[in-house]
Amino acid sequence: MSSSLIFKLFFFSLFFSNRLASRLDSDDDGKNIYIVYMGRKLEDPDSAHLHHRAMLEQVVGSTFAPESVLHTYKRSFNGFAVKLTEEEAEKIASMEGVVSVFLNEMNELHTTRSWDFLGFPLTVPRRSQVESNIVVGVLDTGIWPESPSFDDEGFSPPPPKWKGTCETSNNFRCNRKIIGARSYHIGRPISPGDVNGPRDTNGHGTHTASTAAGGLVSQANLYGLGLGTARGGVPLARIAAYKVCWNDGCSDTDILAAYDDAIADGVDIISLSVGGANPRHYFVDAIAIGSFHAVERGILTSNSAGNGGPNFFTTASLSPWLLSVAASTMDRKFVTQVQIGNGQSFQGVSINTFDNQYYPLVSGRDIPNTGFDKSTSRFCTDKSVNPNLLKGKIVVCEASFGPHEFFKSLDGAAGVLMTSNTRDYADSYPLPSSVLDPNDLLATLRYIYSIRSPGATIFKSTTILNASAPVVVSFSSRGPNRATKDVIKPDISGPGVEILAAWPSVAPVGGIRRNTLFNIISGTSMSCPHITGIATYVKTYNPTWSPAAIKSALMTTASPMNARFNPQAEFAYGSGHVNPLKAVRPGLVYDANESDYVKFLCGQGYNTQAVRRITGDYSACTSGNTGRVWDLNYPSFGLSVSPSQTFNQYFNRTLTSVAPQASTYRAMISAPQGLTISVNPNVLSFNGLGDRKSFTLTVRGSIKGFVVSASLVWSDGVHYVRSPITITSLV
């Protein structure tokens, strides 16, 4: 498949699937914002805008307006954002030097105890000087520099390699902890309520940055909940904040601009708790493009898998060169007790910080608003309940909804009881609230109709032991991978449920202003910075490792998870639950570099011309460079087959020793009935650091279910280098 055909297929699918959304950027003349991606940066980056202008003049002629070029990408790769008609975009796509042209899309945010739960206590050994020279780039909603998590006491000046800058608008100041801050808002006005510059008034970016690299703050809590010492995975590391997300979302144009700067500024790792609603192919995906060029410069991107679960095919974090992170539970769970007037108590879930008080109790079905009946008001949907009849009462709603949904319609209520079959994570709400099991809510309704003056108390949340943890949470997006079905995604799982971290004092908590320094929220947005912090910690001990080597270390040392709790198996949790300390000394790694990804791209339909534009070198797709997906040196093994089809597939891999001493590893296979898995050779001897050995894994058999899991472990008796083998009929 040629690169131009790839463009045309994705151009039209993207255009029609996003026609309605793209109107947000559309002018009256039918022009929309497009990104023209042209691969590696020019040798003379300062000439990029002249080159781009010449291209546009060829297409639009005398009607060309310089202001239509919204942004030029030139520091780390080559491209521009521009307003075009559909016809103009097609013409540019066919021009020499263009890799892809795609509509600008809005991405979305994927929104303590966690580190101890991971076996990563405050007392772990650290290479303090190395950690202090590492810069974590966070692409998010900005940052709140006044948070105690970003105090720079004891920090030396920024490392000499740092080339970034600090925007100082709206009284924003960097320090020796936050050493860089930029903001991007290309091609559209600032939304009402947004603050120009890198200051975070949403909270999301402050929370993720402090989870990855925040300093130690004792007595951190949310109104008494989660009390303890807040800290990031690498508290001595520096932070560079790139604000790409605003009230209207996270634009492709802004994400690419941030990558362009972050790579050139000198960040060492990128944390990106953002993603698209729909999967896209690699070079019509801003995150895939940015992270590819980051890998070229030795920079790993940790990216949230998304919050679209629990169904299959919901993750949009698909690129093999980035680390896709699922969210899992930890052993602390917040619960909110409810006691009704007859003395019965029920355990619900929420983050409820409000004081305990007894209030009258009413069912939403009994107080329908004008124009509604009880069949609608029972669910408390928007404006369906009578505001005059709920004042000062706890309302029972036979549904559940997020912190910002419908609560304006419940203004004046004293509290809300909701219900859901899925209660594996807790939210904050603007009123005393608890989400009950459906049977407990039914018992509450029976009580209401058994007495003249029913009432209830919603107690402040407490914590209980969650013995089943870690389990991938229901909202975490799942694979398989829609772009390349035999590359397993997500890659790994980390804590993403009910995470306490820093928060701007001006940002809302549960939909209302609470003036707190910390907040408890859930999402793959929260698991992503945990993995960022751990990857950075691994890098402090192994500073010369490639992004792929760090990724391999995390994946092959991850703790296996139980498919009984997550029937989607590896498509829920990837290689398993992260194990920070084991990842520092994995023994062996599956390494990969740019040339490996070029071979992979050749196998995905990109031709020599396309890959040369992307890489800026003499890479080529040849008959001997087929780029079989099963030969990409990936730390997991994926195979998609037809149901009941007999298959016989082989995978080629190469392992690199990262231990100084000689060692011998033996292969151990775990496979269910119906699968025959062999490894040749099944014993590998390494002479020491950097020695490489290759092997072939062959899988034969047939499967009856949707997902069948097996595993390969290489062990020398000390290290256990584990890779999942996942066969699926979900094609």
UniProtKB/Swiss-Prot annotation:
Reaction(s) this enzyme catalyzes, per UniProt: Hydrolysis of proteins with broad specificity
Gene3D superfamilies, sorted: 2.60.40.2310, 3.50.30.30, Peptidase S8 propeptide/proteinase inhibitor I9 (3.30.70.80), Peptidase S8/S53 domain (3.40.50.200)
Signal peptide: 1-22
Tissue expression pattern: Specifically expressed in fruits. Expressed in sarcocarp (at protein level).
Enzyme Commission number(s): 3.4.21.25
Temperature dependency: Melting point at 81 degrees Celsius.
Stored PANTHER family: PROPROTEIN CONVERTASE SUBTILISIN/KEXIN (PTHR10795)
Entry similarity comment: Belongs to the peptidase S8 family.
Protein name: Cucumisin
Organism (species): Cucumis melo (Muskmelon)
